[in-house]
Each structure stands twice: as structure tokens, then as C-alpha cells.
Amino acid sequence: MYNIVVPDPKFISFQKLELNDLPLMQKWLNESHVHEWYDKNEKNTLEEIIKRYGPKISGEKPSDEYLVLYEKEPVGFIQTYKVNDWPEFADYVGYDDHAASVDLFIGDISFMGKGFGSMMLNKFLKDV
């Protein structure tokens, strides 16, 4: 855990999510500050996380998943996908054929309340 007053965007990077990252995803998805907003109706056992994210990691499902790194240490998660690749979501939000979506969360609570979410989104849009 970090003790940072204001994170520096130059230390933010992204790494494709891999199967060996899923225990960390399970930990984060069960943290109250994440679970309240992200996958809150899902069961977050490791088995369920593997079922949910394994097909995305392997390319069977159309979504790009990344760990967000700060000084090369994982601190969050971001994913992007074309809305029309997920019909149940597309029907819910409405879309055009070119619409994309980005979902993210900060897993390391020490980065909360410091503007890190908008920093990581801006950096992602520039770098990835």
C-alpha cells in the first residue's frame, strides 16, 4: 500500500490481464469500495472470477482487460469493449455502431480520493 499525497501520471502504465492476475482481481472485487459499484450482484469466488474473466483474457469474448500499474505495481483495473459486442448491455444503454465503453476501478484504496481515477483514464486513452 502506498502513502502518496498526489500520484504522478508518468508512473502509470497498463498490462494485459492474465489468468495469474485473477486472485488479485478476486481480492479487489470483494473490497467494499469496489464491490459497492462493480460487479456488485456477482459472486466473487475465484471460480466465478475465472468464469467471468477467463474468456475475455483468452479472446473468446470481445473485451480488452488491463491491470493498472503504478511504479510497476498493480493498483487498479480497466477494460474496454465495443458496446454492440454485448447486446444485453447495448439494449440497456442505447448505442450507435461505433460506441465503446470503458469500465475501471481503483483496487488499492490508498489511491482513492486523489484524482487517480481520472488520471488513469486519461493516461489509458493516450497510451492504449
Protein language model regions, located:
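Conserved N-terminal entry element of GNAT/NAT acetyltransferase domains
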Residues: 1-19
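Hydrophobic alpha-helical core bundles mediating ligand binding, dimerization, or RNAP-core interactions
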Residues: 26-29, 53, 102, 121
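Helix-loop element at the rim of GNAT/NAT acetyltransferase active sites that forms part
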Residues: 27-44
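TRNA-binding/sensing appendages of the translation machinery
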Residues: 23
